[in-house]
Each structure stands twice: as structure tokens, then as C-alpha cells.
Amino acid sequence: MQVGVLAVQGAFAEHEHVLSELGVPCIELRNAGDLNKHYDALILPGGESTVQGKLLRDSDMFDTIKSQIEGGMPVLATCAGLILLAQHIEGDDTVHLGTLPVTVKRNAYGRQLGSFHTEAELRGIGEVPMTFIRAPYVAEASPDVDVLATVDDKIVAVKYGSQFALSFHPELDSDYRIHKAFVDSIQ
């Protein structure tokens, strides 16, 4: 089993570190040619969703990644990755991959100074540390989307089919249970 980590921008190295600590092989997906390599699951890291969306299109990766996700490839998306998956972005007509039937509010927690760390219950895993950096949250979710966690009555973690999307950055904490649960769901 091998995980492909989108490595065009953002916190991809941190996800790779966690996978390495768990003994899970991974490859960086930097261009369209990398999408021809073998990988069983995908991580869409945090970063800047607008930049990531543009780079996916400019590098001819967009359609292939969208097709893989629509075809059931397991995906773990964090922060900007959640925005990439969302079908709707509040106050913005931009649609990126659009495979997750939710509406997100971008930068919901403000600028860098609005960033924070907390702990909350993530259904199926338990209480986990959550680091929010200019994070989005899910403002609306389709009834078939499984809400896994809320913070201050805001949806911050969802699952839809094989898509697992988080507002926060588990890769920035030393608790690897979220990545382990994701990897375990693939095998």
C-alpha cells in the first residue's frame, strides 16, 4: 500500500513525515506524470486552496485527481484540501474538485492571529488535538455526509464515502491516530 501526497503547495512534507512515522510508503504528486505512478490513496494537504486549485489545473492534474476521487479512491483532505473537495464555497463561485457535497466558509477563523489549538471528540477515534490555521469550517452538509466532529457548534470533520475531510491540521500534532485511522481504512 502506498499513499500519494499532493505536493504542489502547502503542508505536504508534514503529512509525509507522519506517514513515515507510521511506516507507510508515500510518493509526492507534483505533476501529471506522477499520477501514472501507483498509489492507493491520496492526501490533499493544507495550504492555500486557490493556489493549489490553479496549480492542479496548470499542471494537468485536476481532471485525473477528480476522476480518481469520484471513482472511490480514499482521500484525506486537511484545511485547504477540504476547500478543494467542497462543492460550494460561501461567497465564492469558485469550484475546485467539487466531490464533497458540502458548503465551506473559507478563512472562517480569520487571519493568522485567529488561529488556535484545541482538543475535541472525533467520532470513531476519541479526543484529538486540533490545530486551526486560518481554517475553514463546513457551513452546510448534505444529509448523506457523516459529521465526525464539531468545535463551537461548527462542523470541522466530515466523511463522505471514501472522502475524509478536516478543517484542522492533524499533521502538525504528534498524535498520529487520524492518519492511522485513514491508512487502516484503506487496507
Q: Which ranges hold each PLM region?
A:
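Hydrophobic anchor at the start of a short beta-strand
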Residues: 26-27, 75, 163
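N-terminal beta1-alpha1 cap of cysteine-dependent amidohydrolase-like domains
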Residues: 1-58, 63-68, 176-180, 184-187
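A residue-level structural signature of the nucleotidyltransferase/glycosyltransferase Rossmann-like core
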Residues: 41, 53, 74-75, 97, ...
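Amide-donor transfer/coupling interface in amidating biosynthetic enzymes
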Residues: 106-187
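Redox-cofactor binding/interface segments in oxidoreductases and associated redox assembly factors
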Residues: 43-44, 77, 166
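A secondary-structure boundary/capping signal
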Residues: 8, 78-80, 100, 134, ...
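Residues that mark the start of a beta-strand
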Residues: 2-4, 96, 162
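Cysteine-nucleophile active-site neighborhood
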Residues: 49-120
